[in-house]
């Protein structure tokens, strides 16, 4: 099998396509959550903490010299990233919890008994005939 045919068979499987869609949606969801945290969650928290803008919080390790930029530890951006992660992780947890509860409900649903085989039907007919003969 040629490499192109193998790749086509691999890419056309349902799992690969589902995974690609999930990655694209996940990336878009991550951007939405990042904007939500940076633009909606953190400003009120900053106001509560005395007008702090978290994206500007940093430690200067080495001041800017000439054309060289300052060396800083931007812990404010890190705090925002941790909040992003926490919200995304919680949303994924809640989604998986909902999916798992639906799966459990499907598993708990009583299954219909299997249809009797031809042998079982024949034995039932013989039993019924014998019972009918005894009752006469």
Swiss-Prot record:
<feature type="transmembrane region" description="Helical">
    <location>
        <begin position="54"/>
        <end position="74"/>
    </location>
</feature>
<feature type="transmembrane region" description="Helical">
    <location>
        <begin position="32"/>
        <end position="52"/>
    </location>
</feature>
<keyword id="KW-0406">Ion transport</keyword>
<dbReference type="InterPro" id="IPR037673">
    <property type="entry name" value="MSC/AndL"/>
</dbReference>
<comment type="function">
    <text>Channel that opens in response to stretch forces in the membrane lipid bilayer. May participate in the regulation of osmotic pressure changes within the cell.</text>
</comment>
<protein>
    <recommendedName>
        <fullName>Large-conductance mechanosensitive channel</fullName>
    </recommendedName>
</protein>
<feature type="transmembrane region" description="Helical">
    <location>
        <begin position="79"/>
        <end position="99"/>
    </location>
</feature>
<keyword id="KW-1003">Cell membrane</keyword>
<dbReference type="GO" id="GO:0006811">
    <property type="term" value="P:monoatomic ion transport"/>
</dbReference>
<dbReference type="GO" id="GO:0005886">
    <property type="term" value="C:plasma membrane"/>
</dbReference>
<dbReference type="GO" id="GO:0008381">
    <property type="term" value="F:mechanosensitive monoatomic ion channel activity"/>
</dbReference>
<keyword id="KW-0813">Transport</keyword>
<dbReference type="Pfam" id="PF01741">
    <property type="entry name" value="MscL"/>
</dbReference>
<keyword id="KW-0472">Membrane</keyword>
<keyword id="KW-1133">Transmembrane helix</keyword>
<dbReference type="InterPro" id="IPR001185">
    <property type="entry name" value="MS_channel"/>
</dbReference>
<dbReference type="InterPro" id="IPR036019">
    <property type="entry name" value="MscL_channel"/>
</dbReference>
<comment type="subunit">
    <text>Homopentamer.</text>
</comment>
<keyword id="KW-0407">Ion channel</keyword>
<keyword id="KW-0997">Cell inner membrane</keyword>
<keyword id="KW-0812">Transmembrane</keyword>
<feature type="transmembrane region" description="Helical">
    <location>
        <begin position="9"/>
        <end position="29"/>
    </location>
</feature>
<comment type="similarity">
    <text>Belongs to the MscL family.</text>
</comment>
<dbReference type="InterPro" id="IPR019823">
    <property type="entry name" value="Mechanosensitive_channel_CS"/>
</dbReference>
<dbReference type="GO" id="GO:0016020">
    <property type="term" value="C:membrane"/>
</dbReference>
């Amino acid at each position: 099998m040629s490499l192109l045919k193998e790749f086509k068979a691999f890419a056309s499987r349902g799992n690969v396509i589902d995974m690609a869609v999930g990655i694209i949606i996940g990336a878009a969801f991550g951007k939405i959550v990042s904007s939500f945290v940076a633009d909606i969650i953190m400003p009120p928290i900053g106001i509560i903490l005395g007008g702090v803008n978290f994206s500007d919080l940093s430690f200067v390790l080495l001041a800017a010299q000439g054309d060289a930029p300052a060396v800083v530890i931007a812990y404010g951006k890190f705090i925002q990233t941790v909040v992003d992660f926490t919200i995304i992780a919680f949303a994924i947890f809640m989604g998986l919890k909902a999916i798992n509860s639906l799966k459990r409900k499907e598993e708990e649903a009583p299954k219909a008994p299997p249809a009797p085989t031809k042998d079982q039907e024949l034995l039932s007919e013989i039993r019924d005939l014998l019972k009918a003969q005894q009752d006469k």
